[in-house]
Amino acid sequence: FFKIVKILILFLLLAFVGAGFYAGNIAYETLLTAPWEKILGVTKHRADLSRMHSREEKDGWQPVEIRSADGTKLHGTYIESSRESPYTVILLHGLYQNRSMSMPYADMYRDMGYNVLLIDQRGHGESGGSHTTWGLRETDDLDAWTEWLREKDGGVKIGMHGVSLGAAMALIYSGTEKGKEISFYVADSAYGGMMELGK
């Protein structure tokens, strides 16, 4: 009798461990490949950009579309200062947001005489990609944006202002070779580590 019970317990234990590995593998694959909207039910960051589009039309702001190194389409809006300026600041929004959330900062920088580039980070707004890569591909994206600015104006001096996820991306970029060419960084409410995102 005890031999049968031991075999049954061993079988149940192996089945439980096997089911755990299977479920863990499914969760891992989902987190790597599924869009954030599917995982978290969040769609706001893909939502309404009509206010941005109306300002583009009304105020003559320039909609911009470029491609990152991996071919991902990236969208942004370039706003020229009312007075001639060699300075342009790139505004990086937070997680689950889009470039329209950076508009108050755009107004602030324009009042100080800066040109402004508001961007949708990958997986957000109108930019391609299903989710953020937490800096893995975003540094390539920022390379592409800074290159676009330098092609537009060879003498441009670039600053970068990020909020939350955008601040973290700015800090990550500051450690890259091309990131050292940026004139200044503003990191507003950056998180110190990935664990803080779960709080």
Across the structure, where does each feature detected by a protein language model lie?
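An N-terminal hydrophobic leader/cap segment in hydrolases
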Residues: 11-67
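A short loop-to-beta-strand scaffold at the N-terminal edge of the catalytic core in hydrolase folds
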Residues: 69-80
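Short beta-strand element of the alpha/beta-hydrolase
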Residues: 86-94
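The serine-hydrolase catalytic nucleophile loop
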Residues: 95-108, 121
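Conserved alpha/beta-hydrolase
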Residues: 108-128
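Alpha/beta-hydrolase active-site loop
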Residues: 132-153
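Alpha/beta-hydrolase fold nucleophile elbow
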Residues: 153-164
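Hydrolase active-site cap/lid region
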Residues: 172-199
